[in-house]
Amino acid sequence: MVLASIFAWLCMSAHADLSFDGQNRFVMKGKRLPITLVNEGKEPALAEISLDWGTDGTGQALPFAVSRPLLRLGAGQRAKVEVLYQGQGLPTDRETYLLLSVLDVPHATGKGDALQIALRHRFKLFYRPSLKATVEQAMAGLTWFYDPEGSPRTRNPSPY
C-alpha cells in the first residue's frame, strides 16, 4: 500500500510541457498539414515527431514526410511543423488512419538526483482525400438497425 501511494505521488507531479494548440486529433485534407507545437514550460524541450500506420501496419513505407522531425523549442516558444504527403500510395476512395507520434524530451535540470521522464504523445491523424460524394449523401446512405443483443447499430457503406 505504501509503495502504491509513493508511485501515485510521483505520477501526480509529472506533466507535459508540450501542447498542440488544443488539438487532440488531426485531419489532413490536402498534401500538407501544418501542426503548431507550443512549449508551455519554463525550460527548453526537444520534440521528436514521427508517423506510423494507424492499423497493424502494411509493411509498406509511409508516403509522408515531416518537415522538422527533430525540433528544439525554447521556453514559451511556438513552432510549426508540416506533415507532407507525396501524392500517391494511399487509397483515393476512403480515409486513411495514421498515428502522429511526438516524443517530448525535457531539458536536463543539472541537479544530481533528478528523475527526467520523456512523454510520448500519440494523436490520430486521418488523411482524407477529396471524395466525390458529399457528407449529406453519405448521411443519407446510413442504415440503422438493432443487433441481436438489442443495441442500436449503424452500417456506413460510404467512404466517410
Name each model-derived stretch:
Residues 2-4, 14:
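Cleavable N-terminal signal peptides
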Residues 9-13:
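N-terminal signal peptide c-region/cleavage motif recognized by signal peptidases
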Residues 15-38, 134-153:
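Beta-sheet-dominated interaction scaffolds and their linkers
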Residues 33-39, 83, 98-103, 151-156:
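Buried hydrophobic-core signal for structured, non-transmembrane domains
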Residues 42-47, 157-160:
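Short acidic/proline- and small/hydrophobic-mixed sequence motifs that coincide with surface turns
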Residues 46-50, 54-70:
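Short beta-strand and strand-turn-strand segments in soluble, beta-rich domains
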Residues 61-90:
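Intrinsically disordered, low-complexity Pro/Gly/Ser/Thr-rich segments with frequent PxxP/GP/PP motifs
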Residues 88-132, 136-137:
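Terminal connector regions
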